[in-house]
Amino acid sequence: NVEGKIRKKIVNHGYIKGIIGLPPNLFYGTSIPASIIVVDKENAHARRGIFMIDASEGFIKDGNKNRLREQDIRKIVDVFNNQIEIEGYSKMVSLDEIQKNDYNLNLPRYIVKYEEEDNQDIEGHLLGGIPKKDIDKLERYWKVFPTIKNVLFNETTRTGYSELNCQPEQINETILNHEEFASYKEQLYNVFNDWKTRHESLLYNLDHESVPKTVINKMSEGMLEVFDNIPLIDKYDMYQYIMSYWNETMKDDVYMIVENGWKANEELAPENLIIDRYFSKVQEEINQQEANIDQLEQEKTAL
């Protein structure tokens, strides 16, 4: 067909640099998934493949539509610009492979997503015990907390099964009180405090010459940097936290300070925030005294 001939010619000329598959139901008027085709004639003659990204699962529900989050957009940009191959997400597909597929550019032909089936262990249901294969699926956690695994689970006489060393309602407490978890928690605090220390001066020195977009760019880049390669933490989740806070709360404050200065905005901090931070005990005493007054008023009325 004509469409196939056009696609073949464009691919063979090397004009397509990348294809990015987006989630369904993003745009009004259509619920089908959309794709971004990156066309770039620069160095087209030397291009021997097309970089493909399947970002169809990175979104959040927003009413009856789906919406890309800040972290979804940032991950797409980072992966594409750096040509990072991630299993089930991105891949550099050679022209030879595309030719073997008759120039079909549908992403599922090249990027395979493995969805694990919910297999039930019948023996475990009938005879009890926790299948070791289920425990082994949490290997990424056991690498960080190697001895917690032995604290939580105990070998049984049946091969392939373990049992809990504590009551189910004690699992959280057992983990939270373990020294390995405490050490990991401290590591996260140290990483976060490192990020905070790096950027305190950026906020303290806000003035009319500051550029708000530059401020959040530096802070968000720093967040990605410090949480890169931290086990069990997705740096893009952390990026989303700072971007959400910026969009919902912090952005307006920064713009006000840049426009009017600190003095003009000295009432930015809510009164209850100051009380909770510096006078919480005094507030508790006031609340107690007010409760006592109410009680006395009720007794007086009763008399």
Language-model-detected regions and their locations in the chain:
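A conserved structural/catalytic subdomain of Rossmann-like adenosyl-cofactor enzymes
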Residues: 1-303
